[in-house]
């Protein structure tokens, strides 16, 4: 399994966490649930520091971007994430 952590520091963009959170709706979640390679996706925020992003656990390899739902947050923020980290999962409980 693989873990991907993606997040943006938003205080310089004029975009609120609420602006992004309103796009985590039933339709968006259903689109992500259709991705068979995904184990779980967790949307995260830090209101004090203005961080917003997601943690994704992939069962195997991440599929090509063309097979994933549209990246709505990136379209709203209009820039790549500040942090994108990828890890191999050694073990879990």
Predicted regions and their residues:
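Short S/T/G/P-rich N-terminal loop/turn motif that feeds into the first structured element of a domain
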Residues: 1-52, 61-69, 81-93
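A common structural junction motif
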Residues: 72-80
């Amino acid at each position: 399994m693989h873990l991907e952590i993606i997040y943006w520091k938003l205080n310089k963009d004029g975009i609120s966490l609420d602006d992004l959170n309103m796009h985590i709706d039933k339709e968006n979640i259903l689109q992500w649930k259709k991705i068979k390679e995904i184990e779980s996706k967790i949307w995260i925020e830090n209101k004090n520091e203005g961080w917003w992003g997601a943690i994704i656990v992939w069962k195997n390899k991440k599929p090509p971007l063309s097979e994933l739902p549209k990246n709505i947050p990136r379209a709203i923020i209009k820039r790549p994430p500040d942090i994108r980290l990828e890890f191999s999962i050694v073990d879990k409980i």
